[in-house]
């Protein structure tokens, strides 16, 4: 993987712990951190060609797929949580995770001059 140490260092600087996994010859990266309320969270991406640009693109894809309210509902169903404040905290946690993943992807994208950072902005979600 291109600049593997740089990718891991940048991830750590953004609060993510990263591990690599090989399944049937395909490289995957697991990103882990605790949410702002202390709940463990992780997501996994395929490393593709291993370049910072490819990894950034996969993270941007994850970020664009995350819908905080939907994730909070799923978490409440799985955990058995019932309080409205728990739902609001779960939504806030997912918004924070999405933001932190997006910031990580921006910095990784900046490592790759061929990657257009403007393509990563979710224009349809901006007010």
Model-derived features: where do they sit?
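Residue-level signal for functionally critical sites in structured catalytic/ligand-binding pockets
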Residues: 43, 80, 99, 124-127
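Charge-rich, solvent-exposed alpha-helical interaction surfaces
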Residues: 6, 10, 58, 71-75, ...
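Intrinsically disordered, low-complexity regulatory segments enriched in Ser/Thr/Pro
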Residues: 36-90
């Amino acid at each position: 993987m291109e600049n593997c140490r740089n990718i891991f260092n940048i991830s750590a600087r953004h609060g993510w712990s990263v591990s690599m996994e090989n399944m049937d010859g395909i490289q995957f990266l697991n990103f882990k951190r605790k949410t702002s309320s202390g709940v463990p969270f992780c997501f996994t991406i395929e490393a593709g060609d291993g370049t910072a640009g490819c990894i950034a693109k996969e993270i941007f894809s994850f970020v664009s797929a995350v819908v905080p309210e939907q994730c909070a509902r799923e978490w409440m169903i799985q955990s058995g949580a019932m309080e409205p404040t728990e739902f609001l905290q779960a939504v806030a946690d997912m918004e924070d995770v999405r933001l932190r993943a997006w910031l990580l992807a921006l910095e990784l994208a900046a490592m790759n001059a061929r990657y257009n950072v403007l393509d990563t902005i979710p224009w349809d979600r901006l007010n």
